[in-house]
């Protein structure tokens, strides 16, 4: 009877994972699917609560309890000061769920991983087919009108290269990293994930892949240098050429985008740092006003999403969050998971791909797939 209950529970958890990931991947084509992501993901976490392994870290649970009470008090104060209860509850649940999701050690995560790989291949195919069609025709107007009208994202051409920046692509860098670390080599699936991330054309995705390659191969390169390995005769020139080409292309793209994108980020730094640096302005704090480039009244997503969290809970809250999510990885003998998570934090810092459902998916994948 116990075995039957366990099987049913695991199957049910996998079913909610499937619906949540399907909604996440394909919300760009049917916006109503977005409403299923959080409820299904929350149900999955509840069903996996018996697989949460945090008791081995003595300092973790007291720190999490402190974080829980800190967010509760911050949320109450913010609500009293007129902040939206919906926004407050949203960030309250997300900030509490991410560290818990990181503690899920599902021994049978293979099923969830296979489901995700299938969904990701389907999504990658649609992105790449769109990219190819736009590249051949050199016309993106119809696609862009669709993306803008439905809230699916944006599709355009920059320097002759299409950018298919639609919802659901921000997880592809993490999928590439997890597949590479899991298989210890570049597989066809891993390459497909990386190519799809590059097809999206977001500079953050490029940064994520580049940072991972540097973190992973940096120590290997140092060992080769110490041992005076002959492979360096071929590796160093190739690396120099690749870095030069990458740098030239990045600088060229940045010149085109800098006038608007970087100006918006600078403006957001000014807006989001106008807060109490220690405790913030309160959980769910509604940013008001704006600047030359944009109005921010009621916004909950920013290019600098990390700074928005800082705006709400200050250094104490943000610092505690980072400790909670770094401790479990830092205390492991192998630091591969820590490297992958730091890579995620780096490439999402300047973009709105953290502190949301993507962040929860990322830590679940890093914890259960990276070996």
Which positions does each model-derived feature cover?
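Hydrophobic transmembrane helix bundles of membrane-integrated enzymes that assemble
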Residues: 2-253, 298-371
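Long extracytoplasmic/lumenal interhelical loops at the membrane interface
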Residues: 252-313
């Amino acid at each position: 009877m116990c075995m039957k209950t366990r099987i049913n529970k695991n199957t049910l958890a996998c079913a909610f994972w499937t619906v949540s990931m399907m909604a996440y991947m394909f919300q760009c084509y049917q916006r109503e699917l977005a409403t299923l992501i959080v409820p299904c993901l929350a149900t999955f976490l509840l069903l996996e609560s018996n697989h949460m392994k945090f008791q081995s870290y003595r300092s973790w649970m007291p720190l999490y309890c402190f974080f829980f009470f800190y967010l509760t008090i911050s949320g109450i104060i913010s609500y009293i000061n007129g902040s939206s209860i919906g926004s407050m509850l949203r960030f309250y649940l997300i900030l509490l769920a991410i560290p818990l999701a990181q503690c899920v050690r599902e021994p049978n995560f293979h099923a969830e991983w296979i489901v995700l790989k299938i969904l990701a291949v389907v999504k990658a195919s649609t992105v790449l087919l769109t990219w190819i069609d736009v590249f051949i025709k050199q016309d993106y107007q119809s696609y862009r009108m669709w993306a803008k009208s439905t809230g699916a994202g944006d599709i355009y051409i920059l320097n002759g290269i299409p950018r298919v920046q639609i919802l659901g692509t921000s997880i592809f860098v993490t999928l590439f990293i997890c597949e590479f670390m899991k298989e210890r080599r570049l597989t066809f699936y891993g390459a497909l994930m990386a190519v799809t991330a590059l097809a999206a054309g977001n500079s953050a995705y490029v940064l994520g892949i580049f940072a991972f390659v540097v973190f992973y191969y940096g120590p290997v390169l140092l060992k080769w240098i110490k041992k005076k390995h002959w492979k360096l005769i071929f590796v160093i020139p190739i690396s120099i050429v690749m870095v030069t080409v990458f740098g030239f292309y990045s600088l060229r793209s940045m010149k085109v985008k800098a006038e608007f994108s970087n100006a918006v980020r600078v403006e957001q730094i000014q807006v989001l740092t106008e807060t109490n640096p220690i405790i913030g302005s309160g959980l769910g704090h509604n940013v008001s006003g704006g600047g030359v480039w944009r109005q921010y009244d009621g916004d909950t997503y920013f290019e600098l999403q990390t700074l928005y969290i800082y705006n709400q809970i200050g250094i104490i809250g943000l610092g505690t969050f980072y400790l909670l999510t770094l401790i479990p990885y830092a205390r492991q003998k192998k630091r591969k998971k820590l490297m992958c998570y730091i890579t995620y934090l780096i490439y999402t810092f300047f973009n709105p791909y953290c502190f949301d459902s993507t962040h929860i998916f990322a830590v679940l994948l890093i914890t259960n797939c990276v070996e």
